[in-house]
Amino acid sequence: MAIKKYIANADNTISNAWQSNLTRRATGSNMGAADVLETYSVYARAYTSSAENKQVELSRILIKFPVDDITSDRSSGIIPASGNVNFYLKLYNAETSKTVPERYTLTVQPVSQSWQEGTGLDLENYLDYTVGNTGSDWVQRTKDDAGAILNWVNAGGDYLTASNYDQLFEGGLENMEVDVTILMEEWIGGVYSNYGFGIALSASQEITASYNLTGAATSYYTKRFFGRGTQYYFKRPAIEARWDSRIKDDRGNTFYSSSLSTASENLNTLYLYNYVRGGLTNIPDVGTGLLKVSVYSGSIDNSAPSGSKMTLVQDDTYVTADSVEYATAGYVSTGIYSCSFAVTASKTPPTRMFDVWYSGSNRYFTGSFKPQTLEASQISLRPTYYINISNLKQSYRSDENARFNLFVREKNWSPTIYTKANGLVETETIESASYRVYRQIDALEAISYG
């Protein structure tokens, strides 16, 4: 699983709450530079007349992400094409001494007009006023280059109500994690303009008013998330792009075809990695095209391919009836090609085989592998493995792409050798594993399992 985070590039809290004197509202206040974002709904705290809208106190979140960066990364191949990647909106709960509601739903909707972040900080008394300055609030959305003030059509923000995402908060303190893949793809594809997300309580839990007759007659106060200006690096609001980037290369764990396995399980998948001056590069004469892979037994000392091409098992995908002496290899990504095939063991099967990758008369690569024979067992095997990262460092740069080398062995393996000393201990190959990344000093989980 690959994860790439895109941190928010603008956020703000807008509110129409009463200030502490209960005589003036915060509709002109801006909180764009605050390190916390807040949403709530308060019922009848300042009921001063029969006008029902004076009962309403609301706070909503505006947040925007760099979709242009995501589009650029897709064009350069950093993230996959549409359909092969999911996007998740991640916001992290901010601890507070204030009350927190339970069993409420937050709704995420795309904002339909542009807005400015602003420089206000005051989330308590709402004293940082926009009042004609740059920034958005409950009424104003932006100030243009000519100095003109542009307001929302609807106080509290304008949203595309046809596209919304909900998350239920049972205990109230949960983080937000919402799959927003469909909307992100629409932004990337230009179906809608990217004006960010609006986050608020669901319509049934925001206070009842003339414009929301099905609203609640109770309070939900308050839910806070860390904003993009927070000092906590791992708790900044982000869009997470997630995709399956696994390359399961069977070169170190190949098997002869067996009736104990299904046809798909009998396939061994091998890869070719074309590194040129330290970087993966397509083979010039092949590009994104196809290669052929033939398998040979070894010479007497098993140091090189020898003899004729071996007959592979026909699967009608990689090996066809007309080409049982080679498997068709395909393009995976820049500089990486793969092929899959099954091979049947002879009465005295070779202990080492060689795979030759070629196109026409050009040979590009010769590799080797040691196939194993699959056997049934009279006992149930559930091995436990010990894993060591052999190249782990104390620290890494934030812009570093680190590759970890794992040494794997079974728990009950004994290194004691009585008959012959051997300085090379071979690692085990495991088919699947999960990992998480957490900070040791406080157990903060940066990446969870799965």
Where are these regions (language model features)?
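Short, compositionally biased P/S/T/A/G/V-rich stretches that sit at domain boundaries
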Residues: 243-263, 275-278, 363-418
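Intrinsically disordered, low-complexity transcriptional effector regions of transcription factors
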Residues: 314-316, 321-324, 332-339, 352-356, ...
